[in-house]
Design a protein with these regions (language model features):
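A contiguous binding-surface segment within folded domains or other stable secondary-structure elements
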Residues: 29, 50, 72
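Long, internal low-complexity/basic segments
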Residues: 83-160
Length: 160
Protein backbone atom coordinates (compact mmCIF):
# COMPACT_ATOMS: atom_id res chain seq x y z
CA UNK A 1 0.00 0.00 0.00
CA UNK A 2 1.35 3.41 -0.95
CA UNK A 3 1.12 6.39 1.32
CA UNK A 4 2.10 7.56 4.75
CA UNK A 5 0.69 7.32 8.24
CA UNK A 6 -2.42 9.35 9.04
CA UNK A 7 -2.06 8.84 12.78
CA UNK A 8 -1.38 12.55 13.38
CA UNK A 9 -4.54 13.50 11.49
CA UNK A 10 -6.55 11.14 13.69
CA UNK A 11 -4.98 12.61 16.80
CA UNK A 12 -5.22 16.29 15.84
CA UNK A 13 -8.03 16.44 13.31
CA UNK A 14 -5.81 18.51 10.99
CA UNK A 15 -4.31 17.53 7.66
CA UNK A 16 -0.79 18.58 6.73
CA UNK A 17 -0.69 21.17 3.92
CA UNK A 18 1.01 18.66 1.62
CA UNK A 19 -1.51 15.88 2.26
CA UNK A 20 -2.73 14.11 -0.89
CA UNK A 21 -6.09 15.33 -2.15
CA UNK A 22 -7.11 12.05 -3.80
CA UNK A 23 -6.74 8.31 -3.23
CA UNK A 24 -6.58 5.70 -5.99
CA UNK A 25 -7.75 2.16 -5.39
CA UNK A 26 -8.30 -1.03 -7.35
CA UNK A 27 -10.60 -3.93 -6.53
CA UNK A 28 -9.14 -7.04 -8.15
CA UNK A 29 -11.48 -9.71 -6.81
CA UNK A 30 -13.89 -9.79 -9.77
CA UNK A 31 -17.07 -11.60 -8.65
CA UNK A 32 -15.21 -13.37 -5.84
CA UNK A 33 -16.80 -13.99 -2.45
CA UNK A 34 -19.41 -11.22 -2.59
CA UNK A 35 -20.06 -10.72 -6.31
CA UNK A 36 -18.53 -7.26 -6.78
CA UNK A 37 -17.19 -6.64 -10.29
CA UNK A 38 -13.54 -5.75 -10.77
CA UNK A 39 -13.05 -2.00 -10.77
CA UNK A 40 -10.74 0.90 -10.11
CA UNK A 41 -11.49 4.30 -8.69
CA UNK A 42 -10.46 7.64 -7.32
CA UNK A 43 -11.81 9.22 -4.16
CA UNK A 44 -11.49 12.82 -3.08
CA UNK A 45 -13.21 14.54 -0.18
CA UNK A 46 -16.02 15.61 -2.49
CA UNK A 47 -16.32 12.88 -5.14
CA UNK A 48 -15.85 9.20 -5.87
CA UNK A 49 -15.26 8.11 -9.47
CA UNK A 50 -15.43 4.38 -10.24
CA UNK A 51 -14.79 2.43 -13.43
CA UNK A 52 -16.08 -1.14 -13.50
CA UNK A 53 -14.01 -2.99 -16.08
CA UNK A 54 -15.79 -6.27 -15.43
CA UNK A 55 -12.96 -8.76 -15.98
CA UNK A 56 -11.12 -11.05 -13.65
CA UNK A 57 -7.41 -11.81 -13.80
CA UNK A 58 -8.30 -15.20 -15.25
CA UNK A 59 -11.05 -16.77 -17.35
CA UNK A 60 -12.88 -18.40 -14.43
CA UNK A 61 -15.49 -15.68 -13.93
CA UNK A 62 -17.93 -14.28 -16.48
CA UNK A 63 -17.46 -10.80 -17.88
CA UNK A 64 -19.71 -8.05 -16.52
CA UNK A 65 -20.51 -4.80 -18.33
CA UNK A 66 -17.96 -2.00 -18.16
CA UNK A 67 -19.33 1.28 -16.86
CA UNK A 68 -18.71 4.45 -14.89
CA UNK A 69 -20.15 5.79 -11.66
CA UNK A 70 -19.64 9.18 -10.04
CA UNK A 71 -20.90 10.13 -6.60
CA UNK A 72 -21.08 13.60 -5.11
CA UNK A 73 -20.09 12.75 -1.55
CA UNK A 74 -21.16 16.13 -0.15
CA UNK A 75 -24.73 15.74 -1.45
CA UNK A 76 -24.88 11.93 -1.42
CA UNK A 77 -22.55 10.45 1.22
CA UNK A 78 -24.24 7.04 0.97
CA UNK A 79 -23.47 6.84 -2.76
CA UNK A 80 -27.04 6.21 -3.86
CA UNK A 81 -27.28 8.49 -6.93
CA UNK A 82 -24.86 8.01 -9.82
CA UNK A 83 -24.33 11.47 -11.37
CA UNK A 84 -21.80 10.40 -14.02
CA UNK A 85 -24.12 11.38 -16.88
CA UNK A 86 -25.45 14.59 -15.33
CA UNK A 87 -24.36 17.52 -17.54
CA UNK A 88 -23.58 19.63 -14.47
CA UNK A 89 -20.83 17.16 -13.53
CA UNK A 90 -19.13 16.96 -16.95
CA UNK A 91 -16.16 19.09 -15.88
CA UNK A 92 -15.86 17.10 -12.63
CA UNK A 93 -15.71 13.85 -14.63
CA UNK A 94 -13.02 15.27 -16.91
CA UNK A 95 -10.93 16.50 -13.98
CA UNK A 96 -11.28 13.27 -11.97
CA UNK A 97 -10.34 11.14 -14.99
CA UNK A 98 -7.17 13.20 -15.37
CA UNK A 99 -6.40 12.69 -11.68
CA UNK A 100 -7.17 8.97 -11.96
CA UNK A 101 -4.75 8.61 -14.86
CA UNK A 102 -2.06 10.55 -12.99
CA UNK A 103 -2.45 8.48 -9.80
CA UNK A 104 -2.32 5.21 -11.74
CA UNK A 105 0.89 6.22 -13.46
CA UNK A 106 2.41 7.62 -10.25
CA UNK A 107 2.19 4.22 -8.57
CA UNK A 108 3.14 2.22 -11.66
CA UNK A 109 -0.29 0.82 -12.54
CA UNK A 110 0.06 1.30 -16.28
CA UNK A 111 -1.98 -1.78 -17.16
CA UNK A 112 0.94 -3.76 -18.57
CA UNK A 113 0.56 -6.56 -16.01
CA UNK A 114 -2.97 -7.34 -17.21
CA UNK A 115 -3.25 -6.17 -20.82
CA UNK A 116 -6.74 -7.68 -21.28
CA UNK A 117 -8.07 -5.53 -18.43
CA UNK A 118 -6.21 -2.44 -19.66
CA UNK A 119 -7.70 -2.93 -23.14
CA UNK A 120 -11.18 -2.70 -21.58
CA UNK A 121 -10.20 0.40 -19.59
CA UNK A 122 -9.01 2.10 -22.78
CA UNK A 123 -11.94 0.96 -24.93
CA UNK A 124 -14.56 2.25 -22.48
CA UNK A 125 -12.66 5.29 -21.14
CA UNK A 126 -14.76 7.86 -23.02
CA UNK A 127 -17.97 5.82 -22.73
CA UNK A 128 -19.54 7.10 -25.94
CA UNK A 129 -22.70 5.70 -27.55
CA UNK A 130 -20.85 2.77 -29.16
CA UNK A 131 -19.18 1.82 -25.86
CA UNK A 132 -22.51 2.02 -24.04
CA UNK A 133 -24.17 -0.21 -26.64
CA UNK A 134 -21.37 -2.76 -26.28
CA UNK A 135 -21.66 -2.63 -22.47
CA UNK A 136 -25.40 -3.25 -22.78
CA UNK A 137 -24.75 -6.34 -24.93
CA UNK A 138 -22.20 -7.59 -22.38
CA UNK A 139 -24.88 -7.11 -19.72
CA UNK A 140 -27.36 -9.23 -21.71
CA UNK A 141 -24.71 -11.92 -22.24
CA UNK A 142 -23.88 -11.92 -18.51
CA UNK A 143 -27.55 -12.33 -17.61
CA UNK A 144 -27.91 -15.25 -20.02
CA UNK A 145 -24.79 -16.88 -18.55
CA UNK A 146 -26.15 -16.54 -15.03
CA UNK A 147 -29.64 -17.77 -15.93
CA UNK A 148 -28.48 -20.82 -17.91
CA UNK A 149 -27.65 -23.05 -14.90
CA UNK A 150 -31.00 -22.27 -13.28
CA UNK A 151 -32.90 -23.10 -16.47
CA UNK A 152 -31.04 -26.41 -16.83
CA UNK A 153 -31.60 -27.47 -13.21
CA UNK A 154 -34.16 -30.23 -12.62
CA UNK A 155 -37.55 -28.98 -11.54
CA UNK A 156 -38.70 -29.81 -8.04
CA UNK A 157 -41.64 -32.20 -7.84
CA UNK A 158 -44.85 -30.78 -6.49
CA UNK A 159 -46.08 -32.44 -3.30
CA UNK A 160 -49.24 -34.56 -3.61
Amino acid sequence: MQGRSFKTICETGREPADWKKAAYYRYWMHLAHHDNPGHLGLRTKDYKLIFYYGLGRDDKTPRTPPGWELYDLKKDPQELVNVYDAPTYASVVTDLKKQLTARRHAIGDDGSDYPEIEAVVQEFWNYDAAARAKAEQISHDFRATMEAPAAAAPKAKKPN
